[in-house]
């Protein structure tokens, strides 16, 4: 059985490196365009909790530029509208290149979700991975 040799991408004259392409990838475009989308609550009048965990949150420290990593925990009681999950994922991913503090990022997430779906109650918790031997947990709450 013969195997074809593995081609070195740099030996292909038509290959382009990521740095050489000026067109953004479809995922980057979706993230850049990402806005929170909502839909009607299917059970208006019934009080229930929605728990969402987003374990891949990243942003950049506004002072050092180093990346910060966190798990974002959302718990909310919807009123008339519910946040669509793919839109929420793309919205969260939009923070990856932003220079923003732990405190501001968690507060901004809460403000944006409240503006999008006006829940009866919401808690947003950012559990940031330790950096420099410091572990930070930021929790904010809003209630009508």
Swiss-Prot record:
This is NADPH-dependent 7-cyano-7-deazaguanine reductase. Belongs to the GTP cyclohydrolase I family. QueF type 1 subfamily. HAMAP family: QueF_type1. The keyword Acetylation does not apply. Its EC number is 1.7.1.13. Transmembrane segments: none annotated. One of its GO terms (biological process) is tRNA modification. Residues 1-27 are annotated as: Disordered. SUPFAM superfamilies: Tetrahydrobiopterin biosynthesis enzymes-like (SSF55620). It is an enzyme of class 1 (oxidoreductase). Substrate binds at residues 83-85, 102-103. Pathway: tRNA modification; tRNA-queuosine biosynthesis. Gene3D superfamilies: 3.30.1130.10. It catalyses: 7-aminomethyl-7-carbaguanine + 2 NADP(+) = 7-cyano-7-deazaguanine + 2 NADPH + 3 H(+). Residues 1-21 have a biased composition (Polar residues). It comes from Acaryochloris marina (strain MBIC 11017). Catalyzes the NADPH-dependent reduction of 7-cyano-7-deazaguanine (preQ0) to 7-aminomethyl-7-deazaguanine (preQ1). GO terms for cellular component: cytoplasm. The keyword 4Fe-4S does not apply.
């Amino acid at each position: 059985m013969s195997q074809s040799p593995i081609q070195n991408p740099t030996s292909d004259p038509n290959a382009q490196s990521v740095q050489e392409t000026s067109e953004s990838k479809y995922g980057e475009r979706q993230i850049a365009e990402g806005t929170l989308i909502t839909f009607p609550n299917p059970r208006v009048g019934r009080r229930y909790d929605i728990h969402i965990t987003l374990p891949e949150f990243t942003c950049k420290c506004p002072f050092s530029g180093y990346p910060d990593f966190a798990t974002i925990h959302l718990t909310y009681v919807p009123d008339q509208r519910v946040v669509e999950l793919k839109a929420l994922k793309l919205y969260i991913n939009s923070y990856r290149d932003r220079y923003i503090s732990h405190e501001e990022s968690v507060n901004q997430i809460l403000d944006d979700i409240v503006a999008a779906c006006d829940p009866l109650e919401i808690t947003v918790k950012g559990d940031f991975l330790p950096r420099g031997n410091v572990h930070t947990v930021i929790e904010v709450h809003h209630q009508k």
